[in-house]
Amino acid sequence: MADSRDEPLVLGIETSCDETGVGVVRGTTLLADAVASSVDEHARFGGVVPEVASRAHLEAMVPTIDRALKEAGVSARDLDGIAVTAGPGLAGALLVGVSAAKAYAYALGKPLYGVNHLASHICVDQLEHGALPEPTMALLVSGGHSSLLLSTDITSDVRPLGATIDDAAGEAFDKIARVLNLGFPGGPVIDRYAREGDPNAIAFPRGLTGPRDAAYDFSFSGLKTAVARWIEAKRAAGEEVPVRDVSASFQEAVVDVLTRKAVRACKDEGVDHLMIGGGVAANSRLRALAQERCEAAGIRLRVPRPKLCTDNGAMVAALGAEMVARNRAASDWDLSADSSLPVTEPHVPGQGHPHGHPHGHDHVHEVSKENLYS
């Protein structure tokens, strides 16, 4: 991907949901990954509350930026650019990050890059396994997204092949965890219980796997309903619900469909690399089954460490560094948060700034830099 001689130093800000993430990278090398999570504040509601998330971002933003810079051992004045998630995500949460990034970039006189949350989830793998092959097939699975994407250039060309038509995989994990009274978030706890259960104990349905169904689309609403009804029927009959077997059987139904469709997409498109990202990619069974099926199909699997699969600022910085290295246009100062930013737009370029510098270094910038970071 980027020229090895060109390793831009970039700070990335991520606030699309409930994690305030700030990362610093130099090219494809991770220097810092600071995260402040508000997940505990949402747990009692059984899901993410947008207003709570936005307020938490406001409180955590400056301390998390300072922590990332300190962890990286770099000065803000040395940055080559500042990247921020512009979308998709929760509108209010995104706005906090975008506003902070604009303020820092303006004060420091640095180019600003508004980038796509989903494209960032793909690009983060560069920090783990080196430059992304082109093309790369990506399976992104999280609480808000379940998508199959083909990337020939992570900074400019990401093509959606399929997506969920109803619920995302992570959303289904959260729902079933609630029905089983296991708490929130559901992914990690179901993964834990499933390890002691039988994945073949209960035959739960696999959505959109018929011969006439969309080859690369996903559907988890029917599975979610089927599992919930099975549990309710057990309780109504006064029987004990086998939590471990239910967890394992439900989880197997999800990862079976995800991996089957991802491998098929690789074969159909002639791509020999599969990258899996997003919060659900931290699931141990998804990783194991994907590895098994990829090996059988002659496909190389790339999955970042679990900490880089969940939302973080490092992934935003990684994509920002790629934008700088490839001389992509920086964003304008009127960059706005876009809760439905399509993945076909890996970043939000400004108008008329082909070299990525939307402003000059005027007196205001120079004075601001001295005041803030002298």
UniProtKB/Swiss-Prot annotation:
Protein origin, superkingdom:
Bacteria
Q: Which Gene3D superfamilies match?
A: 3.30.420.40
Q: Name one GO cellular component term.
A: cytoplasm
As one GO molecular function, the record gives: N(6)-L-threonylcarbamoyladenine synthase activity
Any one Gene Ontology BP term: tRNA threonylcarbamoyladenosine modification
The enzyme's E.C. designation = 2.3.1.234
| Alphabetized NCBIfam families for the sequence | gcp_kae1, T6A_TsaD_YgjD
Q: What is this protein called?
A: tRNA N6-adenosine threonylcarbamoyltransferase
User: What lineage does UniProt assign to this protein's organism?
Assistant: Bacteria, Bacillati, Actinomycetota, Actinomycetes, Kitasatosporales
Q: Encoded by which gene?
A: tsaD
